[in-house]
Amino acid sequence: MSGFFITATDTEVGKTVVAGALAGVFRELGYNIGVYKALQSGHVASNPEGDAARLKVLSGVPIKEDEICPYSIEEPLAPRLAMKRAGRAVTLKDIIHHYNERLKEFNSLFVEGAGGLAVPYTEDALVIDFAKELQLPLIVVARPTLGTVNHTVLTIAYAKAHGLTVAGVILSGCKECEMERVQENKVMIEELSGVPVLGLLPFFEGEFTKEEVLESAKEYIMISKLEEFIRNESTVAHTSSN
């Protein structure tokens, strides 16, 4: 298996934009990349304001929103609680099944979690349990300013304690007027965590187009570094199958 698991230090940090943009860029480069978000709360999958719809638009994948996100609920709560209140039982086995179904169509998947790694996800698992099952390298999306060093370093430490590989950090929502502090935070995160910050994605104000987001990803994220992970994972998978 190859791809990335996109997590974050919190909710509303920019995971969906990062996941969709990276998938879109890699698809432009010729990779057969898909996107997957197992559980979504706050919007049903078909809602154009929801994460599944945004992932579809940004990535350009030729599948339906409910194939990107098989389990969605309107109420904006942690997925486990939202599903429980709706009387729906979703297990870790269920979401892994749908993940494997998507792998029949794509060589690699960029998987978006929900909130951070310790979020209650299915009725029997946290987000980190799902990440451990997939064993994909993590991309941690974080805020660029005050508080981000602590949140990001703790997230990385938690992931490493559970045996996960962290490919890098992307600081999302960077404003030009804050860049001096953002750069200082970048350096501090790298020093304290030992993980590279692979991008400083700008703040998108108001409505934005797919083209704007993908061009920003190409300009501000180290795509070549992430491409090395994809190639290495593919090589390992090919070697293991022989």
From Swiss-Prot:
Quaternary structure and interacting proteins, as annotated: Homodimer.
One GO CC term, this protein: cytosol
The protein, known as: ATP-dependent dethiobiotin synthetase BioD
Residues engaged in binding substrate: 41
Subcellular localization(s) per the UniProt record: Cytoplasm
Sites where the protein binds ATP: 12-17, 51, 112-115
InterPro entries the record matches: DTB_synth_BioD (IPR004472), P-loop_NTPase (IPR027417)
Gene name of the encoded protein: bioD
Family, per entry: Belongs to the dethiobiotin synthetase family.
Gene Ontology terms: biological process: biotin biosynthetic process
Reaction(s) this enzyme catalyzes, per UniProt: (7R,8S)-7,8-diammoniononanoate + CO2 + ATP = (4R,5S)-dethiobiotin + ADP + phosphate + 3 H(+)
Catalytic center residues: 37
Source species of the chain: Bacillus anthracis
MF-aspect GO terms: ATP binding; dethiobiotin synthase activity; magnesium ion binding
Reported function: Catalyzes a mechanistically unusual reaction, the ATP-dependent insertion of CO2 between the N7 and N8 nitrogen atoms of 7,8-diaminopelargonic acid (DAPA, also called 7,8-diammoniononanoate) to form a ureido ring.
Residues the record lists as binding Mg(2+): 16, 51, 112
Domain of life: Bacteria
Pathway(s) where this gene product acts: Cofactor biosynthesis; biotin biosynthesis; biotin from 7,8-diaminononanoate: step 1/2
Keywords: ATP-binding, Biotin biosynthesis, Cytoplasm, Ligase, Magnesium, Metal-binding, Nucleotide-binding
Coiled-coil ranges per UniProt: none
E.C. number(s) listed in UniProt: 6.3.3.3
Cofactor requirement: Mg(2+)
